[in-house]
């Protein structure tokens, strides 16, 4: 099975969870990133050559992004009443539904912020994600994906495909 076929199957169960349940996973991920920051910093520094404070800034950005989406996302995904075309005659309710599978191709220079940071809102919205990190920073991406799985993202909902794109 391809990563996309597995993601399509796994996405249905993930989308069936409420946005609040998915937000709890993102909050747990936030906590895990901060608990294991030394390991993440070591990996990111080794792969990118960044100074420790720059790697920390990216790691912290990812954790805070996760927390932000976990806090505001469920409200953004809730049905919203909107003005109808004819104000007194119509009511309109906007509903949000997952798209299915989201593909992310990320560069080497911000392997956590641009790879995982982009995956977080997609996951919160109930989508599955297939991530293809740059070949120079695969271990950093795999580290973050392992934390997301530990936080509660089900198997198949978040996959990593490694290769040079050929």
Roles of regions detected by a PLM:
Residues 1-90:
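N-terminal Rossmann-like NAD(P)+-binding subdomain of aldehyde/semialdehyde dehydrogenases
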Residues 34, 81-166:
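Rossmann-like NAD(P) dinucleotide-binding subdomain of oxidoreductase/dehydrogenase enzymes
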């Amino acid at each position: 099975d391809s990563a996309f076929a597995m993601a399509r199957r796994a996405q249905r169960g993930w989308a069936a969870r409420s946005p609040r349940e998915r937000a709890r996973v993102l909050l747990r991920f936030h906590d895990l990133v901060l608990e294991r920051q030394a390991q993440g910093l070591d990996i990111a520094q080794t792969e990118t050559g960044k100074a420790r404070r720059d790697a920390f800034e990216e790691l912290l950005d990812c954790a805070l992004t996760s927390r932000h989406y976990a806090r505001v996302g469920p409200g953004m995904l809730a049905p919203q009443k909107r003005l109808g075309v004819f104000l007194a005659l119509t009511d309109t309710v906007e509903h949000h539904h997952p798209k299915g599978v989201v593909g992310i191709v990320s560069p080497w220079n911000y392997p956590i912020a641009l790879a995982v940071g982009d995956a977080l809102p997609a996951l919160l919205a109930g989508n599955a994600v297939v991530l293809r990190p740059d070949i120079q920073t695969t271990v950093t991406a795999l580290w973050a994906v392992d934390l997301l799985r530990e936080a509660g993202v089900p198997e198949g909902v978040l996959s990593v495909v490694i290769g040079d794109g050929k």
